[in-house]
C-alpha cells in the first residue's frame, strides 16, 4: 500500500481520469452519464457471470456479450431502469431518455419484460475504448508500484 502520494502520482491519477473522459468522447461518442449507464449494465453482466462461477479473460468477456447465454443470463437476472437510476443517483426519466439513445445505437437492448442487456454493437464500440483505458490503467498501476 502506498503510504504517501506525491504530487506526480496525484497528477497521474487526475490525468488518467481526464484521459478516460476524452477517450469516451473519442471512441464512444456519447456523454459521460450515458457511458455510466452503459458501464452499469456491463457491470451487472460481469457480476452475474462471476456469481455463477464463470470467469472470462479479456477477449472471452467481449465474445460472451454476443451469445445467447448472455441474453438468458440478463433475462434471468433482469436489470431495470429503476435499478440503474438508483445505482447512479440519476432521475429515472434521465436514464430512460439516455437509454433510448443507447438502444437506438444498438449499444444496449431494453424491454420491460426482459430488462436491460448489452446490445449488438456493444463489443465493436466498447472494446477499443477498453484497450485504450487498459493501457492507461496499467501505466498508472506501475507508477503506484514505484511510489
What are these regions (language model features)?
Residues 1-40, 44:
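N-terminal leader segment of winged-helix/HTH proteins
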Amino acid at each position: 500500500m502506498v503510504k504517501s502520494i506525491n504530487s506526480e502520482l496525484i497528477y497521474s491519477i487526475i490525468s488518467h481520469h481526464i484521459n478516460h473522459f476524452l477517450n469516451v468522447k473519442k471512441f464512444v461518442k456519447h456523454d459521460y452519464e450515458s457511458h455510466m449507464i452503459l458501464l452499469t449494465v456491463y457491470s451487472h453482466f460481469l457480476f452475474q457471470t462471476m456469481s455463477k462461477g464463470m470467469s472470462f479473460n479479456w477477449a472471452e468477456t467481449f465474445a460472451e456479450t454476443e451469445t445467447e447465454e448472455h441474453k438468458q443470463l440478463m433475462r434471468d437476472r433482469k436489470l431495470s431502469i429503476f435499478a440503474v437510476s438508483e445505482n447512479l443517483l440519476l432521475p429515472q426519466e434521465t436514464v430512460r431518455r439516455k437509454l433510448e439513445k443507447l438502444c437506438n445505437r444498438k449499444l444496449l437492448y431494453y424491454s420491460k419484460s426482459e430488462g436491460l442487456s448489452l446490445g449488438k454493437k456493444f463489443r465493436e464500440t466498447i472494446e477499443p475504448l477498453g484497450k485504450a483505458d487498459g493501457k492507461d490503467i496499467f501505466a498508472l498501476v506501475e507508477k503506484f508500484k514505484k511510489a
